[in-house]
Amino acid sequence: MVPSRAEAADILLDLDPPDWLLAHVGAVAEIATFLAERCAARGIAVDRELVEAAGLLHDIDKLLPEDDPVQELGHGAAGARWLGQRGYPELARAVAAHPITRLLDADRYGRWNGVATREERIVAYADKRAGQRLEAMSARFAGWAARYPEHRESLARARARAERLEREVCETAGVSPLAVRRLRWVGPALDAARRRRSAERPTAATRA
């Protein structure tokens, strides 16, 4: 089962995400939605709902307790397993495939690139274009290099693979990297989820 926008928003809010993570996953989801819509406009089949939900929930394991058993799987795979356990196995591949670590190792990247679905590629690319907002991939990699200076060489190799991914995704969508945009929907979906949760919360009068 693929969660709807409303269901994905509820899953995310259940884990009390901080504002910085909401900004990031919101940007990823909206960039991914834009790319899926552009593919669809060209008659190219893409599961838009899967792309939206995976984009919004791709970092879900960052919100789980450190002692949750799934954390042993590492970032991405942990979130995929957790979502699968809750009835959303369709999201697993796109969530597991998004981390930058997928691009660091040539053999691992080669295996993934040979079997990756269009939805996986879109979500993985959207993550490389979003920090707290839409940004150039060069800015995203500069941020990683600043945070992990000991991995500069491997990040440079990963960037070359990310540029290949960018070419593939953007060519499929029929846009240039400079033309990539966000298709806004996450803010309204989260606001609606918060209103629902507030309305469902028992008041002092109903508790009495």
Segments (PLM) and residue ranges:
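A short, charge-rich alpha-helical start-of-domain segment used by transcription regulators
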Residues: W20-A23
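Residues within well-ordered alpha helices
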Residues: I11, L35-R38, W82, V169
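Divalent metal-dependent catalytic cores for phosphoryl transfer on phosphate-bearing substrates
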Residues: L13-D14, A41-R147
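A positional/architectural concept
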Residues: A27-E30, F34, L64
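Conserved N-terminal diphosphate/IPP-binding helix and adjacent helical/loop segment
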Residues: V2, V25
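Charged phosphate-binding loop/patch that engages nucleotide di/tri-phosphates or the phosphate backbone
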Residues: E153-A208
